[in-house]
Amino acid sequence: MDHLIIPKDYKPDLNLHDTQVAIKTVKDCFQELLAERLNLTRVSAPLFVDPDSGLNDNLNGVERPVAFDIKEQDGKIAEIVHSLAKWKRYALDKYGFSVGEGLYTDMNAIRRDEETDNIHSIFVDQWDWEKIITKEDRNIETLKETVRTVYKVLRKTEKYMSIKYDYIQEILPKDIFFITTQELEDVFPDVSSPKEREYYICLLYTSRCV
């Protein structure tokens, strides 16, 4: 927990009960808008998979999965998922989705080797989504348009929450800034670390997509 920062004398604006209500409110708002704008259908995701299935994402290849044996299946080993990157593609085919359609899910996972801080935890609770597009649509313009759509959903969610909770301020800029990793390197040639370059571009553009 060396990287967790809690300001001195920090006091939350909501108590624990109301925080849970607010979390549900923001999640409901965001996922409904996202599903509508991107033509996504909610599906249930696995918490664990067969390690021999090839469906567990090994992330960087060094993270150790949490595994356990299943008594009813003669001690067969199952692994808690790291992410759903591979499973989503499998599910799109399994559920029979068509071009222009997609799925989203509320994923839970355990990443035992995660370096924890204010935004990272060994317990993962995040949205995952994937949709089918044509080969012709696999281009930078489709990517940018999709990012803009997601960003608009974020802004609408922010606006909704700012109306519902008066202490929440709208801080997201109207537009999102796009830059490639090569362009970042050209802008900051004296900065060797990619993460540092991303940090510096964030100082110039608070909403950006690399």
What residue ranges belong to the model's regions?
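Extended, charged alpha-beta segments that form solvent-exposed binding/catalytic grooves
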Residues: T105-P194, E198
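Conserved small/polar residues in nucleotide/adenosyl-binding loops
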Residues: Y205-V210
